[in-house]
Amino acid sequence: MFFLLASLLLAFPSTGTELPHLKFNGFLRFNYNYSDWKEGSKKRGGDFGYDLFKLGVAGSYKKILLDVDFRFYAKPSGGAMLKSGWIGYKFNARHQLQAGLTRVPFGIQPYGAHNYFFQIAYYLGLEDDSDMGIKYLYAGDRWEYAFAFFKNSEEELFGSDSETAGDRYSYDVAGRNKEVNQFNGQAFYQWGDETRQKIGASAEFGMLYNLDTEKNGTHYAFAVHHELYWKGLSLKTQISTYAMYPKNKPGESRDIVTMTAFNAPYEVAAKANIYSVSAGYTIPFSKGIVNSIQFYNDFGWMQKWDKSFHDSFQNVTGCLITAGPVLCYVDYAQGLHQPWFGPDWNAFGAGTGSNAWHARFNISLGYYF
């Protein structure tokens, strides 16, 4: 579809009339994965295979904007999916409006970590999340802020009793509850030249519609965050809290909710605090094929409000090697009660499975264009 659209635009004769501008981007990535809790993987010495192909489009026509990020994962991980896609209006260099599947303004932007796996907040739907709605953004010299209303998360089925589909990139509430009517606000203040700093705060409030009781529960989240950049150093810190109050039918727990992405739903504690610290240092190279290497360590802690639950932790140590259009992430990811880094897939819930730290060694190799 993207190539057809580009062909049609190129077919227009040159009449002096302003035409839409389109620019394509994307990447192809492969992954090597060695997980210490998977006996088969250990005996094989790990596995190397296809990760994903991304095709993106950035477009403009006068003051109208277009941005599309479409992902092609393996079929078991959700297959083809729209990560984000919106139509916007640029009032001027500082004010912009976006409508569609647009990024939720919450937490450090665009990411709170340096590694391939993001921060722990991503797996709880509070980092790199996009939902269906409308968003206003302002970007000044010192201040930046955003306000948004999201009608719901990515909706695909449109049935009166349809659960949230699992073939999505970002984590959303699923099962018998659905995210609806969500408001977000975010503000940043930045200063400094040689040493740049940025502080910010984020707030979120919305409803959880239960398909069984047909009643609306509520959910909220707040965060404060700070970023520091000095020469090659990058330091990102964030404190977040969230709570979900679903209106489930009698007999169903309200202390755990279901969230889903990549066709793999799991249980998550309904209330928790999140603490994260991410540090990186970049070394540039002026000769040879390698442009730079960034070393980093990113730590995240999910502190669950329910004292009978076990907290979740993750720590990722690694480096990003950049050689022109080729990016290579080399990560040693450790987790305690973290489903992506351990044997218990519902560890973000009660966390009553393995009480040992587990590790995943991962290499992501990609060509970006």
Where are the regions that the model predicts?
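Short coil turns and loop connectors of transmembrane beta-barrels in diderm outer membranes
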Residues: 18-20, 62-63, 93, 141-142, ...
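Outer-membrane beta-barrel biogenesis signature
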Residues: 8-25, 37-39, 289, 324, ...
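Sequence/structural signature of outer-membrane beta-barrel proteins
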Residues: 31-39, 71-77, 106-108, 113, ...
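Outer-membrane beta-barrel "beta-signal"
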Residues: 277-279, 355-369
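Outer membrane beta-barrel
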Residues: 17-35, 42-156, 188-192, 276, ...
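Detector for outer-membrane/organellar transmembrane beta-barrel domains
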Residues: 189-305, 313, 367
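Transmembrane beta-strands of outer-membrane beta-barrel proteins
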Residues: 22-28, 66-68, 97-99, 145-147, ...
